[in-house]
Amino acid sequence: MSMTDVLSAEDIKKAIGAFAAADSFDHKKFFQMVGLKKKNPDEVKKVFHILDKDKSGFIEEDELGSILKGFSSDARDLSAKETKTLLAAGDKDGDGKIGVEEFSTLVAES
């Protein structure tokens, strides 16, 4: 499964372009722009599993740093600051990683 099975390639391209500048990433705006906010819970979970590159059931800090590449291979990596901000927003139980339910909540709060 690829990201374009769930989200529009055009929406992904626009969202990646909007956050091309270093330290410009805003997960709330990004999730809205790619159309993830409008998706049903099962589709949000599909996106989570695509982003969970090592299939551990969690998106760890290193995977968060390359989250944009999960949407488009030519996207940039997040800065350390952006990664930590995203982790802090999504890691509700403080275990240092984002599980599927935490990801679903993060998207819903966007």
UniProtKB/Swiss-Prot annotation:
A biological process from GO: gene expression
Residues bearing the modification N-acetylserine: 2
Positions of Ca(2+) 1 binding: 52, 54, 56, 58, 60, 63
Lineage top rank: taxon: Eukaryota
Tissues with expression: Expressed in the modiolar nerve root (at protein level).
Coiled-coil segments: none
Annotated protein name in UniProt: Parvalbumin alpha
UniProt domain EF-hand: residue ranges: 39-74, 78-110
Binding residues for Ca(2+) 2: 91, 93, 95, 97, 102
Residues the record lists as Phosphoserine modifications: 2, 8, 24
Domain remark from Swiss-Prot or TrEMBL: AB domain, comprising of helices A and B, is involved in structural stabilization, protecting the hydrophobic core of the protein. It is required for high-affinity binding of Ca(2+) and for Mg(2+)-binding.
Pfam family, one: EF-hand_7
GO molecular function, one term: calcium ion binding
Role of this protein: In muscle, parvalbumin is thought to be involved in relaxation after contraction. It binds two calcium ions.
Family, per entry: Belongs to the parvalbumin family.
Species per Swiss-Prot/TrEMBL record: Mus musculus
Assigned GO CC terms: axon; cytoplasm; cytosol; synapse
Keyword Repeat annotated: yes
Keywords: Acetylation, Calcium, Metal-binding, Muscle protein, Phosphoprotein, Repeat
